[in-house]
């Protein structure tokens, strides 16, 4: 029997909705694979499951960190694997769009346990992505072949690990795939339709109180909190400081979310193990259930 069912794909493709319905049908639980939903108080802007949804189906790996804490991929992997090994439910649903979180589980990535050094990161980031990627090519050409030149997050992390340990990150990584069966399901739709979904979700977040959430978080933790510089929060923060109008903030959020979704699609499409389904199919739940039940 399949131990773990992964539901992945770009943002706004309906992963959470499908997972909720699937979990209720299968009597399962949900493990989040979202790098921002792990943080408490960041709710609306991360599209975190509502309290009603959490009551309907048990959710794990959300609200497990304070906003000023750091959750590394290694931290996530350790907690997720512990849950997978201990929860007396099968199958479990691993749901989200954070590719590294999912890869750390399905491929059993061996991850360097190197804590982030924010002072070093600030110094490295100030060099600019082009210069930083050039450094990566020099100190770790193997990692540079795997990291896109326009991926500042992974570039920065790889260079940071080298500067801290003196050992290339590629030499510290490896894989130890789990011995339990995994089924990977991906949701996707045409880019035009995905853009419509992103528009609708952005409007809904504003209606649900995103502006108030950002204002509260800025007052409580300070506007320079790194999480407040992430997608959906940074744009509203610009509105609150008077830099742009609310309409412009919404337009920027849609634009940046669309760009992010394209990167996610590229990431997940590179995995041949993922079976893809049309997110807009009217019988999506039934089709996915049939796929799961196939021998």
From Swiss-Prot:
SUPFAM superfamilies: P-loop containing nucleoside triphosphate hydrolases. Residues 34-37 are annotated as: Interaction with substrate tRNA. One of its GO terms (molecular function) is tRNA dimethylallyltransferase activity. It holds the Pfam family IPPT. The keyword Transferase applies. It catalyses: adenosine(37) in tRNA + dimethylallyl diphosphate = N(6)-dimethylallyladenosine(37) in tRNA + diphosphate. Keywords: ATP-binding, Magnesium, Nucleotide-binding, Transferase, tRNA processing. The record marks 98 as: Interaction with substrate tRNA. Its cofactor is Mg(2+). The keyword Cytoplasm does not apply. ATP binds at residues 9-16. Substrate binds at residues 11-16. GO terms for biological process: tRNA modification. Its EC number is 2.5.1.75. Monomer. PANTHER family: TRNA DIMETHYLALLYLTRANSFERASE. Belongs to the IPP transferase family. Catalyzes the transfer of a dimethylallyl group onto the adenine at position 37 in tRNAs that read codons beginning with uridine, leading to the formation of N6-(dimethylallyl)adenosine (i(6)A). This is tRNA dimethylallyltransferase. It comes from Nostoc sp. (strain PCC 7120 / SAG 25.82 / UTEX 2576). The gene is miaA.
């Amino acid at each position: 029997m399949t131990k773990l069912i992964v539901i992945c794909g770009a943002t706004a493709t309906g992963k959470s909705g499908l997972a909720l319905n699937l979990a209720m049908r299968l009597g399962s639980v949900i493990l989040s694979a979202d790098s921002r939903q792990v943080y408490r108080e960041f709710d609306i802007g991360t599209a975190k499951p509502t309290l009603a949804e959490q009551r309907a189906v048990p959710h794990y790996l959300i609200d497990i960190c304070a906003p000023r804490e750091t959750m590394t991929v290694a931290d996530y992997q350790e907690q997720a694997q512990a849950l997978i090994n201990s929860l007396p439910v099968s199958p479990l649903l691993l749901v989200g769009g954070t590719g590294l979180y999912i890869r750390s589980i399905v491929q059993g990535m061996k991850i360097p346990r190197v804590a982030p050094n924010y002072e070093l990161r600030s110094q490295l980031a100030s060099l600019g992505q082009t210069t930083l990627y050039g450094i990566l090519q020099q100190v770790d050409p193997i990692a540079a072949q795997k990291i896109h030149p326009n991926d500042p997050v992974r570039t920065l992390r790889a260079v940071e690990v080298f500067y801290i340990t003196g050992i290339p990150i590629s030499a510290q990584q490896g894989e130890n795939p789990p011995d339990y069966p995994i089924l990977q399901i991906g949701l996707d739709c045409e880019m035009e339709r995905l853009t419509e979904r992103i528009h609708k979700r952005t409007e809904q977040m504003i209606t649900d109180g995103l502006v108030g959430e950002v204002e509260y978080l800025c007052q409580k933790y300070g506007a320079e909190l790194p999480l407040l510089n992430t997608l959906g929060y940074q744009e509203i923060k610009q509105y609150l400081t008077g830099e742009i109008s609310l309409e412009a903030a919404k337009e920027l959020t849609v634009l940046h979310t669309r760009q992010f979704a394209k990167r996610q699609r590229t990431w997940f499409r590179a995995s041949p193990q993922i079976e893809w389904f049309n997110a807009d199919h009217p019988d999506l739940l039934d089709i996915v259930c049939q796929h799961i039940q196939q021998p």
